[in-house]
């Protein structure tokens, strides 16, 4: 990460650069499976909370999860937060209908400092493939816990760790060797962001460790669902009543 002082700064700078290619990149590198996983995230919200929900889509990127939340009859209002201005601009174009209905708010912000939001403000907070990019994981989780209402849910979809050594070898080869090449093809040349995306998984906690971190910081009833042998994982955590 040569050009900026922090991981968050690097990520913001480079997500702004690749914003208009990001959705296609996700389709390519996951064989469209990320769409199914995001649908599952929204179904978890619908199945575990009541109606007229106020949901924050944190690290919302281009609004992939936000669009799905907007289509849910259970969700009354969506707050989209990301520190990439270019990503947010794409999200705004995808959520035009929800903007016209007054159902969505956009905010440039950092997951570790949600100072524009009150305590106990949201019924649920979602993150899709963003938590591993924050500078301070624990600080971000504490902020999420703070803004959730008692009984509210935090749903985090991100990369996971595969236990089976043979499948892990195949997954690592694909993730570290093939995925950057897909990015270069899409970009039309080398871009350091497509090298960073696989590398970012190395320091990110595995499924059980993230579960333990969430519990230690105050969440309860923490569970997770593995996808594709654990290559991706959805954690669901509840704020105590």
Task: Show where each model-derived region lies.
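A short SAM/SAH-binding and catalytic strip from SAM-dependent methyltransferases
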Residues: 123-137
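Core SAM-dependent methyltransferase catalytic element
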Residues: 217-241
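C-terminal alpha-helical "lid/dimerization" subdomain adjacent to the S-adenosyl-L-methionine
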Residues: 157-213, 217, 223
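A short glycine-rich, Lys/Arg-flanked "PGG" loop and its adjoining helix->strand segment in the class I
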Residues: 138-153
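Conserved alpha-helix/loop element of class I SAM-dependent methyltransferases that forms part
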Residues: 31-53, 68
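Class I SAM-dependent methyltransferase SAM/SAH-binding core
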Residues: 54-114
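N-terminal, positively charged/glycine-rich alpha-helical extensions of SAM-dependent methyltransferases
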Residues: 1-23, 186
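A short acidic, Gly/Pro-enriched loop at the edge of an enzyme's catalytic core
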Residues: 112-125
């Amino acid at each position: 990460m040569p050009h900026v002082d922090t991981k968050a700064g690097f990520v913001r700078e480079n997500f702004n650069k690749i914003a208009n290619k990001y959705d296609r990149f996700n389709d390519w590198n996951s064989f469209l499976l990320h769409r199914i996983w995001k649908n599952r995230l929204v179904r978890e919200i619908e199945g575990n909370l009541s109606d007229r929900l106020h949901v924050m889509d944190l690290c919302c990127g281009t609004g992939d999860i936000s669009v799905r939340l907007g289509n849910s009859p259970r969700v009354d209002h969506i707050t989209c937060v990301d520190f990439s201005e270019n990503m947010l601009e794409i999200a705004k174009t995808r959520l035009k209908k929800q903007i016209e209905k007054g159902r969505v708010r956009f905010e440039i912000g950092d997951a570790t400092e949600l100072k524009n939001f009150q305590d106990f403000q949201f019924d649920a907070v979602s993150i899709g493939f963003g938590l591993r990019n924050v500078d301070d994981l624990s600080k971000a989780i504490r902020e999420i816990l703070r803004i959730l209402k008692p009984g509210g849910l935090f749903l985090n979809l991100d990369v996971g760790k595969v236990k089976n050594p043979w499948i892990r070898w195949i997954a690592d080869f694909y993730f570290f060797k093939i995925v950057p090449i897909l990015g270069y093809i899409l970009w039309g040349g080398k871009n350091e962001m497509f090298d960073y995306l696989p590398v970012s998984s190395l320091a990110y906690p595995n499924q059980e460790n993230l579960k333990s971190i969430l519990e230690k910081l105050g969440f309860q009833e923490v569970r997770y669902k593995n996808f594709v042998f654990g290559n991706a994982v959805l954690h669901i955590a509840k704020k105590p009543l």
